[in-house]
A protein has these predicted regions:
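Acidic-glycine-rich active-site phosphate/pyrophosphate-binding loop
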Residues: 25-33, 84-98, 135-141, 198-206, ...
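Condensing-enzyme catalytic core mediating Claisen C-C bond formation in acyl metabolism
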Residues: 1-47, 149-222, 226, 230
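Short acidic capping loops at alpha-helix termini that bridge into adjacent secondary structure
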Residues: 32, 68-74, 101-103, 131-133, ...
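Flexible, glycine-rich active-site loops centered on histidine and acidic residues
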Residues: 126-160
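Acidic, glycine-rich active-site loops and adjacent beta-strand->loop/helix elements
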Residues: 12, 78-83, 109-114, 137-142, ...
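Buried hydrophobic positions in well-ordered alpha/beta secondary-structure cores of metabolic enzymes
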Residues: 6-8, 34, 61, 72-75, ...
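Phosphate/pyrophosphate-binding loops at sites that engage ATP/ADP/AMP, CoA/4′-phosphopantetheine
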Residues: 57-73, 230-247
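Claisen-condensing/thiolase-fold acyl-transfer catalytic domains that form or cleave C-C bonds
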Residues: 55-58, 62, 81-82, 95, ...
Length: 294
């Protein structure tokens, strides 16, 4: 049976840095308030579209793998902030990087999106359906923010990260072992953008012009830590490894309280936990690949 490996990686973090002090000039907040609750010190704001950031990250990943864009067989872009609904953001990326031989599509699973896309890329390569997959997580999430809501406005940032997946030739290739993805649909309402999509009231100008967030921070903390700890433990078990074997742990960079609670609950005695939320904020589907590249 074929095994897959990550052979290239790249990222795009916008140059426009927005510090907490910068943000407090137009949001009812302060540096102290933000850091105490989220651990975020700064985040990146993009002046270009999601596909533009994905293009840069993707090109870096392809070059890192020693490939050309024409070598890519499938582009999977994880995002909840696509440039457009039709065509997909992945279609824009295909055109911009010149991956003329690739099938392309978007995956929308919000913060978990990159892991879903990575699992699909692994399955494609290991089934021999495709030889080389470019998997990208990219978000222009600041475009969606409600600046009157400091609970969400202070937390998020923009960015993109990408990896190339190919057949693993040997154990030193960075083989992809196992996944544990899933969803509990019992509490969908704790984090929603309910009026963005076909549920939007297009005939109410005030409603249609505003992107509203439903954000229950306490429930997100409790369910997020519990679910990520369970999924991480299951993935380790599926791989045949033990918790003691793990050297580096790269969780979703939700906020520092969630990351540190997850680190404690999971209990990886020999692992270094990568923490980048202070630099980039929560970049949703881009958080894991950008932290991986950093």
């Amino acid at each position: 049976m074929l095994k897959s490996a990550i052979t290239g990686w790249g990222k795009c973090t916008p140059d426009n840095i927005m510090t907490n002090d910068d943000l407090s000039k137009f949001v009812d907040t302060s540096d102290e308030w933000i850091q105490q609750r989220t651990g975020v010190k700064e985040r990146r704001f993009s002046h270009v579209n999601t596909s533009d950031m994905a293009e840069i990250a993707g090109k870096h990943a392809i070059a890192c793998a020693g490939l050309n864009p024409e070598d890519i067989d499938v582009v999977i872009l994880a995002t909840c902030t696509p440039d457009s609904i039709v065509p997909s953001a992945a279609a824009h990326v295909q055109k911009k990087i010149g991956a003329v031989n690739a099938s392309v599509y978007d995956v929308n699973a919000a913060c978990a999106g990159f892991l879903y896309a990575l699992e699909q890329g692994k399955a494609f390569v290991e089934s021999s359906l495709y030889k080389r997959a470019l998997v990208i997580g990219a978000e222009h999430i600041t475009w969606l923010l409600d600046w009157s809501d400091r609970n969400t406005a202070v937390l998020f940032g923009d960015g993109a990260g990408a990896v190339v997946i190919e057949e693993s030739k040997n154990e030193s290739d960075g083989e992809i072992y196992s996944f544990s993805n899933g969803l509990s649909s019992d509490n969908l309402e704790i984090l929603e953008i309910p009026n963005f999509g076909s549920a939007m009231d297009r005939f109410n100008p005030d409603e249609a012009a505003r992107v509203r967030w439903t954000f229950d921070g306490q429930e997100i903390f409790k369910s997020g830590v519990r679910a990520m700890a369970q999924a991480s433990a299951e993935a380790i078990e599926k791989s045949g490894l033990s918790k003691e074997d793990i050297d580096i742990f790269i969780p979703h960079q939700a906020n520092i309280r969630i990351v540190e609670a997850l680190e404690k609950k999971l209990g990886l005695p020999n692992a270094t936990t990568i923490k980048k939320v202070h630099r980039y904020g929560n970049t949703s589907a881009a958080s894991i690949p950008t932290a991986f590249v950093d």
